[in-house]
Amino acid sequence: MECATTATTPWERVRQRLREEIGEEKFTSWFARMDLDKLTADAVQLSVPTRFLKSWIQENYLPRIADIWAEESGAKRRVDLAVRNAFARPVALKANTVREVVTERTDMHSGDTRQQSARISDGRSTDARGADGRGSDARAVEPRAAAAALSDAVAGDVASGSPLDARLTFETFVVGKSNSLAFAAAKQVAESAPGSAPVFNPLYLHAAVGLGKTHLLQAIARAGAVGGRRTTYLTAERFMYGFVAALKTHSAIAFKDALRTIDTLVIDDLQFLKGNNLQQEFCHTLNALLDGGRQVVVAADCLPGELEHLDERVRSRLAGGLVVELAALEEDLRLEILKARYQTLTEQHPGFAVPAPVLEFLARSVGQSGRDLDGALNKLLAFNQLTGEPVTLEMAENAVKDLIRPTDPKRVRVDDILRVVAKHYNVSRADLLSQRRTATVVKPRQIAMYLAKTLTLRSLPEIGRRFGGRDHTTVLHAVRKIDGLVNADRALAEEIEVLKRLALEA
């Protein structure tokens, strides 16, 4: 992690604050490609490469970015977020490669290295016909060579995969009862010899946020590369971005070939993969890899059958492999994770001391995920460094009071809620997920959304995706609507209590 002292400009300090607040993993996934484009007296113009990133950041973090900017710059400005050209960035990153390939290919026709290099780098020729009298032939070759090089560059950029966090290895993964099977399966996949037949294929890991899916996937990718396997790790967002870029640069064939000739494909956050063309391409890629005996590893926040927006063929193929859940972290595992994270923090901040009873309190009381535990330790570190107050149990209780969970609720699945509500109101599951607006469907659907919000740990956007890909505002409207009706209608309140009990017993 960068030290705060290295951030000299307001924008660098904003990025540093975001990294510290949300963690390196999430920062790398969502904010690493966000750029500061323009700064005026009243506005900050930021940009990201995709509409998906723009939508997610606007929905979840834009107000926070504005607040941090005001704090770090001393001036309150409006923060705007735009989408920059979807494929200019990877091409720019590969500019030298493109230039070299084009020069090499045109040289075969012109025989003059310096003249062709000048044409590529300067975008012009010194003479309409060229010094050797063959200028028109060379110019005819250049667009074809440039297009071929551009195709190679885009495909290579995707095949190189999403960036890996150096901290996410098998050695740093803390194993407990809730994740031991997933860890063992992931390790066996990663350690299989190049060319050997996959044992678990595909390997499908699912869990709620912050329980270790990404950690295991990146560990597989890193170990596979070290072991000599051609391994590519991609987030679903990166896969979508690469496919769109390939279409725009007419390099779809190169894109497909780049992915279908690797040994191991690792896809993270599959629940974000949307769009018929994208799903069709993923389906073809998945089939090509599996049929060719190559390893596929996928992670999502739900079971394959619950990915309602995905094609049924994809869900069926994913369900046909080894499906493993990383369950909620048990208290003993939470304590071990805290000890490991604390050890890392003490190496970075030697004066930071947390007594064992405080770590035990955090393990017993805070959150449901590794990220919750990270947040709690970071709060203690901030309190300690900003106030100079030593970490005690009393100080910890005050510092992390907003992170303390009242009880450990039984985990309820959205699938269970859909089944219970559909049966109770005599409608089908398909009705609840459909776009139908009849009264016999709308009210049960809203009640199901309300129950999903009150009985599960899923966010509004996650619930929306599970209900036929709806927007989070639709879920919020349903929750508020039913909440208001429950307060005014005693019969409905009792009915919902019955549904809650049925869902908890499912």
From Swiss-Prot:
It comes from Xanthobacter autotrophicus (strain ATCC BAA-1158 / Py2). Residues 1-77 are annotated as: Domain I, interacts with DnaA modulators. Residues 103-142 are annotated as: Disordered. GO terms for biological process: DNA replication initiation; regulation of DNA replication. Belongs to the DnaA family. ATP binds at residues 210, 212-214. Domain I is involved in oligomerization and binding regulators, domain II is flexibile and of varying length in different bacteria, domain III forms the AAA+ region, while domain IV binds dsDNA. Plays an essential role in the initiation and regulation of chromosomal replication. ATP-DnaA binds to the origin of replication (oriC) to initiate formation of the DNA replication initiation complex once per cell cycle. Binds the DnaA box (a 9 base pair repeat at the origin) and separates the double-stranded (ds)DNA. Forms a right-handed helical filament on oriC DNA; dsDNA binds to the exterior of the filament while single-stranded (ss)DNA is stabiized in the filament's interior. Residues 103-112, 121-142 have a biased composition (Basic and acidic residues). Keywords: ATP-binding, Cytoplasm, DNA replication, DNA-binding, Lipid-binding, Nucleotide-binding. GO terms for molecular function: ATP binding; DNA replication origin binding; lipid binding. Oligomerizes as a right-handed, spiral filament on DNA at oriC. Pfam families: Bac_DnaA, Bac_DnaA_C, DnaA_N. Residues 77-162 are annotated as: Domain II. Residues 385-506 are annotated as: Domain IV, binds dsDNA. Residues 163-384 are annotated as: Domain III, AAA+ region. This is Chromosomal replication initiator protein DnaA. Its main location: cytoplasm. It is found in: Cytoplasm.
